[in-house]
Amino acid sequence: MLFSKVIAPAFILLGAASAAPGGLAPENASKRDQPSVGDAFDKYNEAVRVFTQLSSAANCDWAACLSSLSASSAACIAAVGELGLDVPLDLACAATATSSATEACKGCLW
C-alpha cells in the first residue's frame, strides 16, 4: 500500500525531473556565480584571524577562561541535554557560569 501511494509517485517525479531538458538548474547560472570551497575556506580563515585579533586586543586568555568555567560544565551539559525544557537547570547553569567566571574571563566575557 505504501509503495503504490508514496514511493512509486516519488520515483516517477524524480525521473521526470531528471529527464527535463536542461535539468533543474537555471539557464543563466554559471560556475562563476557559485562560491568555491577555496573561497569559503578563505572567508573562514579571515573570520578566525579577525576573532583572534579582537580577543588578543581585549587581553582575553581563552584557555584560562575556559578552565575557570569548567566548574559549571556539569550543570550546563545537563541543561543543554534537556534542550531548555528544565528551567531550574538552565538557571543553575547560568548561576554557576557567572559565579565561576574569574578575572581570567575579564577580556572574553565582559
UniProtKB/Swiss-Prot annotation:
Disulphide bridges: C60-C108, C65-C105, C76-C93
Keywords: Calcium, Disulfide bond, Glycoprotein, Secreted, Signal
Alphabetical list of InterPro entries matching this protein: CBP
The keyword Disulfide bond appears for this protein: yes
Induction or repression: Most abundant protein released by H.capsulatum. Its production continues as the yeast multiplies inside host cells.
Gene3D superfamilies, A to Z: 1.10.1740.120
Post-translational modification: May be glycosylated.
Cofactor binding notes: Binds 1 Ca(2+) ion per monomer.
Cofactor(s) required, per the database record: Ca(2+)
Signal peptide per UniProt: 1-32
Subunit structure comment from the entry: Homodimer.
Protein name: Calcium-binding protein
Upper lineage: Eukaryota, Fungi, Dikarya, Ascomycota, Pezizomycotina
